UniProtKB/Swiss-Prot annotation:
The gene is lexA. This is LexA repressor. It comes from Brucella melitensis biotype 1 (strain ATCC 23456 / CCUG 17765 / NCTC 10094 / 16M). It holds the Pfam family LexA_DNA_bind. Gene3D superfamilies: Umud Fragment, subunit A, Winged helix-like DNA-binding domain superfamily/Winged helix DNA-binding domain. Its EC number is 3.4.21.88. SUPFAM superfamilies: LexA/Signal peptidase (SSF51306), Winged helix' DNA-binding domain (SSF46785). The keyword Cytoplasm does not apply. The lineage of its organism: Bacteria, Pseudomonadati, Pseudomonadota, Alphaproteobacteria, Hyphomicrobiales. The active site is at 161 (for autocatalytic cleavage activity), 199 (for autocatalytic cleavage activity).
Amino acid sequence: MLTRKQHELLLFIHERLKETGIPPSFDEMKEALDLASKSGIHRLITALEERGFIRRLPNRARALEVLRLPDSIAPGLSPQKKFAPSVIEGSLGKVASVQPVRPAPAPQNSEAPATVSVPVMGRIAAGVPISAIQNQTHMLSLPPEMIGAGEHYALEVKGDSMIDAGIFDGDTIIIKRGDTANPGEIVVALVDEEEATLKRFRREGASIALEAANPAYETRIFGPDRVHVQGKLVGLIRRY
């Protein structure tokens, strides 16, 4: 599990190596992560090396090699630099009452729509569960290929419990509405009919586990009648 800064630095090094074949300098890494001193970069590199994500090559200046990336990182994903979240305000209530908009099918023999409108329903906790969304705030226009078929809605992420899955506070996530999920999928889960959270779905025997992607948060176990899946993650939007 990586912290947000470790995650950002690993991506920055990976992208620089992919683009130029040369690792970034400590000054470049410090600037990219907006840190005050290079000592912070030294600590992050040591932590990444201890966790087996990178290694320092002997007898070569600035020599770093990326050994692996977290499973959640798709190839080509760019690191955050001075990230400024796009905050989407929303009122709070039950997810269960959300009525997402289903895009109307295009008429036969006509061109497919350039965009699909998806309702933004407010906020969802990626941390300790909070009361979840009820009222639509506005619409997002998205390319159809981003979401595919089905009913969808969007939420603003609040919290840091999913950072090792590449989901950060302030991100906007796209959820495909549904009441089932496979183990390992990231879902919007309604707990006790009143609290919603964004977590990875697991099964522990007859119980349901809601698993964070941040070692600072414990996996929470519930009886099957206490958790209702409200949809699963299919996309993410981040503004820089």
